[in-house]
Amino acid sequence: MSRGAHGIELTSAGKAFLEHARMALLQAEAAKEAALRAAQPARPTFALGFLSGVEIGLLPEVNRVLRDEFPGIEIRLSSDYSPALAKALMRRRLDAAFIRPEEHMGELVCRRVRTDPLIFVFPSDHRLASQVAVAPEEIVNETFYFPSKAAPAVRRAVLEYFNRAGLDLKPEYEVHNVVHAISMITSMRAVMLLPAYTRRYLPESITTRPVKGEVPTLDLVIAYHKSNNSPILKLLLSRVGKLAGAPS
């Protein structure tokens, strides 16, 4: 340290010492943070997928189940079509997913959560709205939209239902998701068969009626890779019965 015309100044040796002191403090702080992290258990994470739309009813209950046992858990959510979620499970990018059963599931294991009935959906002022239930033959002359191939399980259920009813409906018109369905039902006065849980998304201008006679249904399952030994997954699977009672 030296005293000059501009006051006290550090010498070269003093500046070097100060720099070393600053570095030592930074290293000490970093070591302290590392020690604190090491002393704390790793935060558990769980990657969970949902078929688009079903999370509204299931997620609150899933959240309660997991956080009761793992309070600090980080739940990483994904929402997509069932085929995309199944691929993510097979690639181990997801721990579990709520999906429709696919035809080729590979090394995935499924456990049924619930069975969703399909219902007829159409404009509120449609002629079918005067009925308590709708028979399949009553929509023969209507503009009918099918689910697209992006949702193969729903599409297959609808086609098989009409085949059993003896109706040869051709999938000339398709919709890709619930938002698209609402748009087509409203603008084209179309009729559709959709899972009952979609009722929660519909505006007042659209109504629903149950199917008369045999009711087509779709299973919702929780799927996971057979080699996944996660204790979080084990807990979730043990509470499937509780999830079955969640609002659909």
Functional labels for PLM-detected ranges:
Residues G106-R112, D116-P117, E138, V179-S227:
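Beta-alpha-beta core module
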Residues L108-L118, F122-F144, P231-K234:
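Flexible hinge/capping segments at coil-to-helix
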Residues F17-A39:
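Alpha-helical linker/hinge and terminal dimerization helices associated
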Residues R43-M105, V175:
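Central regulatory/effector-binding core of bacterial HTH transcription factors
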Residues T143-A165, S230-L237, P247:
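Secondary-structure junction motif
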Residues M1-S12:
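A short LG(V/I)-centered, amphipathic sequence patch enriched
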Residues Y81-A86, M90-L94, I99-R100, A150-R209:
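Hydrophobic hinge/microswitch elements
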Residues A13-H20, L58, V62, V154-V158, ...:
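Short amphipathic alpha-helical coupling segments at ligand-binding clamshell hinges
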